[in-house]
Amino acid sequence: MFNLKTKQKEKKKEKLEDREKIRSIRFNILAVACIILFCAVLAPITLQNDTFYTIRIGEHILQNETIDMQDPFSWHENLPYTYPHWAYDVMIYLIYSVGGMAGIYISTCIFSSILGISIYKTNSKLVKNRVVSFVITIGAMYMLRDYIAARAQLVTFILFTLQIYLMEQLANTSKKRYGVGLILIGILIANLHVAVWPFMFILYLPYIAEYVITIIEEKTAKKFRKELKEGYKIVLTKRNGVKYLVIVMIICVLTGLVTPLGTTPYTYLVKTMQGNTTQ
């Protein structure tokens, strides 16, 4: 009799879990569909002046099959140029070659949608609440509406969002594949938008700070023989995966060399802040 009741309870529990999974899948499908529609609407139909320059730079690179570090469209002869987003320029030119300006607009809609889905996926992992994740995603995309354009920054937003997702996964699971993903993101940013490459390291700092604080707490508690108590508002948990995160961050410093731009990833930001990117 007892076994029968136990089996009935287990079956009810399984049914409830199955229903919850179905609800979750349905909500995610609906949420993703709404996000794609909303993000596509945010993409501007009119293109910026930079788009024409981007197309020609990409064409120039493919025609010459090299990056000569000189501006081919300047009035001045042999004017140095750093090609800060050469890979993006090539990609946009290839899209333009296939679909013209309409193709670039469609690609902007697609990138915008990918950004929205990436934010939703990352928030779902962090917040653990589908509705809150959806609301945050819509709000974030609305705030970013002025930056949704056929420019390298749109792809960079996607990569930074994916970086946060991979860092969370690596910190929680210590699985190597997430570290490999972070290294690939470092290489992509160095080639797609070199100006913001140094900023990817800033995203590592909160994890390192959290880890250091938890170590200090543990040592302090051990020294005074006290038990660690959870904070009322902020709870810091020591995650061993952060050690691997630090190793990956150090490796990512070398990703700036995996580019045809030489040492530009290490110097471009400083030169930009100094107001000189031609030396």
Model-derived segments and their meaning:
Residues 119-142:
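Transmembrane-helix signature of polytopic, membrane-embedded enzymes
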Residues 169-187, 243-244:
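Short hydrophobic alpha-helices at membrane interfaces in multi-pass membrane enzymes
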Residues 118, 143, 155-173, 204-216:
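Specific aromatic-rich, kink-prone transmembrane helix
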Residues 147-155:
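Short acidic/glycine- and proline-prone juxtamembrane loop motifs at membrane-interface regions
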Residues 46, 50, 62-67, 194-279:
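Transmembrane catalytic cores of multi-pass membrane glycosyltransferases
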